[in-house]
Structure formats: C-alpha cells, structure tokens
C-alpha cells in the first residue's frame, strides 16, 4: 500500500464530523513535525462548537540574497466531513475505509482526506529530494469548512494578517476534478450574498380580503421582477451573477387565514462584474418601487476571487500535463470554499483535488487510480514553485 493511500485511510478512520476533528490534526502534526514544521494550534469558537485549527509552517534556511528570494506556498484544507446520513444505506461502514471495485469508500474519501494525505506525502518526498529548499511551505487545516466556517480558516487568516504573515501561493485541496484527477482546477470562485426578506401585511379572515392585506400577493410581483433581472453578463472568467430563492414561509397553517407576513430566503452567487453593495442597492430599489412594507437582513458569505493565469496556475498546469497528459480546464463554477478567506492575504489561490462526483453522498468514494497522481501533481508543483522561489 502506498504511503498516500495509507494516510488517506488513517484519516477516514477518524469520524471527524464538523466541528469535531477527532484527532486528525494531531495525526498530521506528528507527520509534519519531524520534517521541520512548526505546528501551532489556533483553535477557536465556543465550548459547544469548538473548532480545531492547525497552522504548520516550515521556514527555509535563508541568508543574504536568498532571504529576498524566498516565497511561501500554503496548502489549505479541512479535516471535517459532512454527516453520513442513514448509516444503514451505506454499503460499508462510513468510517471504515473499504476497497471495492477499484475505489476507496468512506466519508471524506474525496472531500477531502485524499487531498490532505496526497499533499503531506508530496511534501515528504519533496523534502527528501530537496532537503534545503528555497521555498517556505505551510499547511492551514481546519475542522470547520463544512459548517458555519466562522471559527476555522477565517479566524486563522485574521491572525496571520495581524502578524504580517506573507503568503504568495495557495493550493486548496477541494475536489475540483470531474472525470480524472487534474482535468479541472478552480482558479476563482463567485461571491455569495444571502438575504432574508420579511414582507409585512395584515392578517385576516380569507373570506374578507378587504379587511386584510395579503403579503404573499404583494410580494409576488417584486419577486417575479427579481427572478427575471439580468444582474450582469459575467465575463471571461465568471458566469453571469445568479439570484435564487431557497425558502418561502408564510401563513399560520390554517387554510382560512390570510397571513400577516411572508419570509423569503434568497441568495446571490455573484461575479466580479457586480459588488455586494451594488446588488443590495438594486434589490432595495425593486422592493421600494413595488411599495412593500418589509425588513431585509443581509449576510455576505464571501467576496468573489480570481487568480489569473500566472506563476501558480502555470506551475499547476505544467505539473498536471507532465503527470497525466491533460490540458486542464480553468473554472470558477460551483460553490464557495475557504479560498475566499485566503485570497484576502494571498494573491494567487487555486483549488485542485480528485473527482467530486460522490462528495456528500451515501457511499462517498475516490478511485484508487486518482490518489497517487494527485500526490505526484502536488509534488511536481512544489518542484516548479521552488525553482521560482530561487529565481
């Protein structure tokens, strides 16, 4: 069994459902410390939702001119996994790593314990071959990416920023591939902006609408306009901004009562062609134009970020091409990731991991043939970046 596969299985065996790290970070710190990494726990959050965070950095020896040339690459990931769902529906126990049909089954197999294992082993191999690199290497790992994401990477980045920590390149190990490891990387993500709209009316008997004011009826024209609005056209890197309703709650449960209010949850996934402030202003303008009596609260989940083709993208593309022969596709589609926090202090952030077809599903799995190539791609990327750090 390869070291990468073995470490992946060891991580899967830890039932690390958000926010419980279940010992994953201790296991990883024990692997990293002998390599010269300074491992620092930056745990955060209340006692009833305590989040485990690990910042682990290996600083290259430097003197004179080398000090100015050295750069830092960070691998970012999460040890937490989503709940298993009904265990009886799994073909094998979700936290017992199981081989079947050329795949490794277990919760977290593809999202994202295989990526973490691949990077750790890639670092081990890189340092064995290059014991005195010009490159600083760091890992940022959290047990709260699948949950609220409040006390995880976000908190660590705030602390690193306060210290003046310099990050040059970041690889997030999210499962970005589609059919084969390396066929797609994410070089950016859309922003996410959520709103909760409460439209107020007057409750009354459904047989006497003249004595009431139905907030559902009042809200529908405004919601129809919002759903039909073209917010922007997108650009070469991002699809157009989208607006979607996720929940509508109104009524008392009785069929003969006009409700006094209706609550609508909605979300923007927005490109760099729009801003959170601009979208908020446009929504308020529509609601005001329709004369609604309403309250609206906003939650900004993350700003969009984009890494244009440059040092990091090219290094990863070269590594993928050398390992697999693939010409990888750059994409910004999909949901958010912790890359949105890291991009605040790191100018180049990409995401690369195994295929994502089974993530969050019953019988989550990763193909065995996708694990070792991922490690090799990470290893080749480290070689490329180390050459750039000393250039």
Curated annotation (Swiss-Prot):
Keyword Metal-binding: yes
Keywords: Amino-acid biosynthesis, Cobalt, Diaminopimelate biosynthesis, Hydrolase, Lysine biosynthesis, Metal-binding, Zinc
Keyword Hydrolase carried by entry: yes
Listed CDD domains: M20_DapE_proteobac (cd03891)
Cofactor: Zn(2+); Co(2+)
Active site: 80, 145 (proton acceptor)
SUPFAM superfamilies assigned to the protein according to its UniProt record, in alphabetical order: Bacterial exopeptidase dimerisation domain, Zn-dependent exopeptidases
Binding residue positions for Zn(2+) 1: 78, 111, 174
Binding site for Zn(2+) 2: 111, 146, 360
Pathway(s) it belongs to: Amino-acid biosynthesis; L-lysine biosynthesis via DAP pathway; LL-2,6-diaminopimelate from (S)-tetrahydrodipicolinate (succinylase route): step 3/3
Disulfide pattern: none
UniProt cofactor note: Binds 2 Zn(2+) or Co(2+) ions per subunit.
GO biological process: diaminopimelate biosynthetic process; L-arginine biosynthetic process; lysine biosynthetic process via diaminopimelate
GO molecular function, one term: succinyl-diaminopimelate desuccinylase activity
E.C. number: 3.5.1.18
Catalytic activity: N-succinyl-(2S,6S)-2,6-diaminopimelate + H2O = (2S,6S)-2,6-diaminopimelate + succinate
Alphabetical list of PROSITE patterns matching this protein: ARGE_DAPE_CPG2_2
Subunit structure: Homodimer.
Family: Belongs to the peptidase M20A family. DapE subfamily.
UniProt-listed NCBIfam families: dapE_proteo, PRK13009.1
Function: Catalyzes the hydrolysis of N-succinyl-L,L-diaminopimelic acid (SDAP), forming succinate and LL-2,6-diaminopimelate (DAP), an intermediate involved in the bacterial biosynthesis of lysine and meso-diaminopimelic acid, an essential component of bacterial cell walls.
Protein name in the entry: Succinyl-diaminopimelate desuccinylase
Species this protein is from: Acidovorax ebreus (strain TPSY)
């Amino acid at each position: 069994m390869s070291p990468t596969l073995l470490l992946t299985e060891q991580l899967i065996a830890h039932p690390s459902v958000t926010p419980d790290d279940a010992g994953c970070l201790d296991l990883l710190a024990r692997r990293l410390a002998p390599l010269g990494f300074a491992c620092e726990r930056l745990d955060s959050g209340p006692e009833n939702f305590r989040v485990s965070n690990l910042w682990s950095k290996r600083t290259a020896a430097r003197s004179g001119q080398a000090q100015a040339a050295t750069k830092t690459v960070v691998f970012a990931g999460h040890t937490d996994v989503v709940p298993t769902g009904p265990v009886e529906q799994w073909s094998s126990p979700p936290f017992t790593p199981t081989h079947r049909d050329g795949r490794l089954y277990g919760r977290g197999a593809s999202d994202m314990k295989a990526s973490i294992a691949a990077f750790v082993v890639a670092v081990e191999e890189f340092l064995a071959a290059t014991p005195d690199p010009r490159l600083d290497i760091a890992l940022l790992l959290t047990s709260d990416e699948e949950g609220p994401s409040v006390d995880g990477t976000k908190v660590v980045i705030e602390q690193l920023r306060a210290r003046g920590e310099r990050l040059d390149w970041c690889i997030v190990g999210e499962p970005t591939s589609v059919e084969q490891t390396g066929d797609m990387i994410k070089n950016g993500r859309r922003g996410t902006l959520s709103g909760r709209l409460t439209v107020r009316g007057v409750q009354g008997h459904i047989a006497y609408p003249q004595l009431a004011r139905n907030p559902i009826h009042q809200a529908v024209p405004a919601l129809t306009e919002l759903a039909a609005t073209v917010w922007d056209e997108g650009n070469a890197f991002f699809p157009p901004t989208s607006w979607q309703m996720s929940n509508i709650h109104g009524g008392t449960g009785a069929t003969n009562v006009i409700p006094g209010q209706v609550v609508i949850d909605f979300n923007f996934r927005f490109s760099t062609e729009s801003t959170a402030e601009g979208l908020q202003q446009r929504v308020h303008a529509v609601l005001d134009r329709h004369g609604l009596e309403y309250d609206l609260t906003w939650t900004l989940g993350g700003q969009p970020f984009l890494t244009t083709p440059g040092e990091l993208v090219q290094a990863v593309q070269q590594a993928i091409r050398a390992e697999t022969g693939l010409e990888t596709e750059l994409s910004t589609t999909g949901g958010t990731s912790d890359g949105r926090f890291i991009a605040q202090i790191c100018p180049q952030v990409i995401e690369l991991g195994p295929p994502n077809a089974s993530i969050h599903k019953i019988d989550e799995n990763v193909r065995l043939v996708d694990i070792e190539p991922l490690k090799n791609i990470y290893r080749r990327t480290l070689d490329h970046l180390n050459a750039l750090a000393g250039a």
